[in-house]
Amino acid sequence: MSDIQNSLREQAREVLLCCHAEKKAQYALDVFTAHQKGELRTSLLENKGWPERPGRPETPELLSPKDMPKRRSGGPAGRIGLLHALAHIELNAIDLAFDLLGRFENTPMPEEFYTDWLRVGAEEAKHFMLLQGRLKSLGRHEGPLP
């Protein structure tokens, strides 16, 4: 593994930039596992800059809550809408956790900072995958709702 590949910051950057929701979640879990095994350094030899925004799938289009269509909360469609919203929240939580791992490159942080945020990111990834699995069992996925 090269110095860049085994850099926690670089791996966090790659999670953040990933545009495919399921791959992002799996990659977050893989980075957590690699860190647990001691395979990642918490410093970076090369600064590629930090993304302003996380990678996102082309769909669904991100809208302000005020621009979202009103959905009924009851019935199967309402439950699917709720699961979909929760999956989207978990995807954003993955990005928030992994953004924190690299954004403060010039501020020395204790190892526990990285360990804790990696754990948070991995937990959010697990939550996303559980919700995604449930949505798939209902014939849907995290993405645009009809």
Residue ranges and their predicted role:
Residues M1-P146:
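Non-heme di-metal
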